[in-house]
Swiss-Prot record:
Monomer. Belongs to the glycosyl hydrolase 13 family. GlgB subfamily. It is an enzyme of class 2 (transferase). SMART domains: Aamy. It comes from the Bacteria. The keyword Glycosyltransferase applies. Catalyzes the formation of the alpha-1,6-glucosidic linkages in glycogen by scission of a 1,4-alpha-linked oligosaccharide from growing alpha-1,4-glucan chains and the subsequent attachment of the oligosaccharide to the alpha-1,6 position. The active site is at D409 (nucleophile), E462 (proton donor). GO terms for cellular component: cytoplasm; cytosol. This is 1,4-alpha-glucan branching enzyme GlgB. Its EC number is 2.4.1.18.
Amino acid sequence: MNPTVELRDIEALVTNLHADPFAILGPHRAEDGGAWVVRTYQPGASRVVLLGESGELAMENRRHPDLFECAVPTAPGAYRLRVEDAWGERLIEDAYRFRGSLLSDLDGHLFAEGNHHRIYEKLGAHPAVFEGVAGVYFAVWAPSARNVSVLGDFNRWDGRFHQMRRVERSTGIWELFIPELGEGTVYKFEIKNGFGHIYEKSDPYAFQQELRPKSGSVVADLDRYSWNDGEWLKRRALSNPLKQPLAIYEVHLGSWMRVPEEGDRFLSYTELADKLIPYVKDLGFTHIELLPILEHPFDGSWGYQVLGYYAPTSRFGNPTEFMAFVDRCHQSGIGVILDWVPAHFPKDGHGLALFDGTHLYEHADSRQGEHKEWGTLVFNYGRNEVRNFLIANALFWFERYHIDGIRVDAVAAMLYLDYSRHDGEWVANRYGGRENLEAIGFLRQLNELIFLYYPGALSIAEESTAWPLVTRPPYLGGLGFNLKWHMGWMHDTLAYFRTDPLFRRYRHNDITFSITYTFYENFVLALSHDEVVHMKGSIIGKMPGDGWQKFANLRALFTFMYGHPGKKTLFMGMEFAHGREWNAYQSLDWHLLDYPQHRQMQQFVRALNRLYTGQPALYEEDCNPAGFFWVDCHDVLNSVFTFVRRGKDPSEQLLFVCNFTPTYHPHYRVGVLETGFWQEIFNSDSGIYGGSNKGNLGGLWSENWAIHGQPYSLGLQLPPLGCLVFKRRKEQD
């Protein structure tokens, strides 16, 4: 037998410093071109026997105690190894006889330039068949690593057994096919850096992770689920969401409802499908928005500190069960939006931080790479492979889980280099400015690709500053989102409604100001989880007055919200006036529905959603100034606001009259453009909802009395802390 392996290569192998263990292990033709040599590295083995086509051959360990080899006269073909060690005897396939790869030269090229939109099909862990043998193909990007191994129960979490090879044609990808593994296998990567330091890391591209506090990745097959939402996807692709009603129910799955009889455990994805979907459908919401369900280690982050970007959290079940949840949403006519967090990630040792011993996913300079306020790290959007990781991730959720949209969290933190930083704590861009040019480019590319691949999808920005053109396409200089949270409306409106009605006349502009800029962007009016945490209290708790007035104020707020241009988002619990501040560790207080006023509030929101989705004037022209005009916004003393919403058909118009004080006006006159009978189609003060039941007996005939610049008018009864909605009855009706 010719000793064709240099001692330095053996030393590199046994010290986990070899970049290509295939150069030593597996079958090799001898230097003289005659016999073949088979080698295997089996630390701790006392005996190894090769079982091949020509029978059994005992392997020798002459050159190193753990390196076994034998000569065979011809190519060994398919063989197995019988290994004897302190744990007994086992029969295994040799991972190093499989030299195939799922990576092509094109894959490496596209990944290096940041344009591999399905890189998740190549990196990570994938069940595969090589040479007729089933197993799992592993691949990981770690360009600065000296050595990478796969760890798991299958090798007693010993990094010496399954060392990966560095792919020559890539930018630092390591790969290995391990036979006889399959779905459900728990694994990690052991990464040795240039200084010899060893890190155990979860797989950034894993499709499933262990339930915290464990941190292993789990092999999952995403091709097993059979979808039944084809019709929904076809309709979505042909739709324009800006012209459709969007009534979004924002949910934190871990605290919407729990099972107190079983240790207050979470509901599973299957149980949530059984309970949450019918509940949302009954209330008339069109979409569910999920606070981040991407895998995260800390419950208290609500999901906003993500480590497993490609894995739905194991808190509620497995990937297939989450697919079924989305599928059942679609079959019930409900869309699914995911909160997505590309702005930052946590520092947990098993995660992305210092992944290969260097600042791989984050900036090396803490002035660019760390959010001091949040204690998290910032992605390096200027690195192609990092940008590819994030963009492919967003596309992955649309492609593999059929989601309908994403809400991108903390966009402002991405756009500004000096976000939450003092002088000297940030680095200017190449022009000396504070704009993060790489993040801007990333967001534009992200949105262009989402709408290229998934027409009719939603990409919503949570952007809290006055950054221009957030919802305009990149070719016009915009960021490319199609919707943005209306943070200004939320701030001003809540400030107004927190004020005692006696003093609201002094905050009149809080209601009118948002209209001056509401058509500069495509907005979502969001009363979100952010408004009911951190000592802010509940939404009903913000309302002034006695018990009756609190509920009346909240009904008036919601009615005004649904009348104001923009799509709608309500956080869970608001629909029945949840009494206490949201606590992510507890279920909502569902027992409140035993009380009439909370049950009536829920009934009110159900009716409001029916009004909204049934009246095109409330959604068709949300982003067009032609869809709104003030009739009267100057009644400061009475805190009354009157406006009209119009649809694509100008004759489709609704008149809103909102009284934000507890004063009842039995003879209040408002101008209308057209003569005829104006039907009262909604009254927030109806006794059905717990109001005082002041109204107009179903409607009013207009009078030839000009007011508010309109040729006709209505003399109506205006209820206290109430909003009325009128629709002119057409002649043929």
